[in-house]
């Protein structure tokens, strides 16, 4: 009986250690809102992490980037700069110029 309890304890311990290391490796961050995911860095600077099912994720659908030389209009320029964490400065001759927000 003691051996079975010891085996169960070791198994639970092993699963806990394994799951913890996996969560650290993929940088799992629990969340309730998108604001909780601000500190998570996504692979590309144009993607903002989102809270999905209680965990922060970098949405793969948004891994497409908008080039600075674009003809998509002012709204796309503003969204592009916002995705970079910057403010739209101006959109002239199909070029989108962003600037860092003032502190």
UniProtKB/Swiss-Prot annotation:
Keyword Kinase: no
Keywords: Antimicrobial, Disulfide bond, Fungicide, Plant defense, Secreted, Signal
A GO BP entry: killing of cells of another organism
Residues spanning the signal sequence: 1-31
GO cellular component labels: extracellular region
Entry keyword annotation includes Signal: yes
Disulfide bonds: 31-51, 37-56, 42-58
Subcellular locations according to the entry: Secreted
Family indicated by similarity: Belongs to the DEFL family.
Protein name as catalogued: Putative defensin-like protein 305
Organism of this sequence: Arabidopsis thaliana
